[in-house]
Amino acid sequence: VIKCNSKDDWKKYSVTFTADEELESDGSGLIVTNTGDSDLDVDMVSLMPEDTYKGHGLRKDLMEQLEAMHPKFLRFPGGCAVEGQTMDTAWNWKDTIGDVSERKEMINIWNPSATEPYMMTYGLGFYEYFQMCEDLGMEPVPILNCGIACQVRSGSATDEEHLVPMDKLQPYIDDALDLIEFANGTDESNEWVQKRIQMGHKEPFNMKYIGIGNEQYGDIYFERYEEFAKQIHEKYPDINLVTTSGTASSGSSNDLAWNWANEHEELADRMDEHYYETADWFRQHAYRYDNYRRDTNTKVFLGEYASKGNAWYNALSEAAFMTGLERNADVVRMASYAPMFAKYGNTQWSAADMIWFNNSDYVLTPNYYVQSLFSNNQGNYSLPTEVKLNGIEKDDALKGGVAVGSWGTHNEFKDI
């Protein structure tokens, strides 16, 4: 029981309690009731365990599974949430720092329903992500909005609801510059350095990478990216910038991105590729990067990838594919499986996830073990190998069929 005596202003109340009995993993919740005669306004409620990973608020059991992988970097806060359904609902990192109770909530792109929306409290914000990276020995790789909402959902994104005009882009570039100060700055007169210190971290986080955009593509994207890159490189030349090739493993947007990078390699250190494909696709594309350009500054960052499933065959196909990533380490400098976590009963994404969890337990998928094996067993050299199979004949015959057709016209085919 908490006795509230605040009349005209907000007041924070904290209490520690222990449940009388073991709670159901997903069938329990916290209910706040008012037993008094007056009205009670509740602005923000947070329920947290006392024992968290290194005392920084994250579940110890889940973080320990990441720790066992010895991960090298974390790309956050993820994908389409950064973009937003519209620019008004895009992720703004400045809303995610400071006192948790004062952070501005935002609707999440994955369920923007007007009647039952999924809201983000930003309880896990950019400061917590930086702290998580430090606790796990990972490089932070934050992704920022580039002035374009999700193009998959908005199509051409030509109106101001989805596309920031070039003459109004500067505040978004300033957000990127301010983030670098928040993460790396040492001048204690700087507003964003002060905010980091006030949150309890005087020393800089030493961030080395920033991604501009998530899965943006086309000329409207690169026109905006170039403005970000020029200003960031001018002020912070040591920051590695990540550009993006869109939403697919191949096609026009991917081709356009690499053509742009070949002409502007000084503006992009990494090209972020994303693809989710079948297990067979991954097995068949283990040689994907064998023929990528090696004489360019812009290297591959495979920022999101997974085969569509958590079965053993999916994991084995990913492992086969990852041998190609290792073999081409001079081309593919970074790779990150996605998504990393999914809560049972609370996700619209079921194609694949690395770790499933509920309120009390977790399940490590075969995909997790493949990622862990590769992460914990990295070598310095890739040795050429040759496999000879005795008694097995190689069938080089072409298989398949040929079809001809037309659309909306009359045709005659002869001598086929």
Residue ranges of predicted features:
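Extracellular/lumenal ectodomain signal focusing on beta-strand-rich modules
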Residues: 44, 209, 270, 304, ...
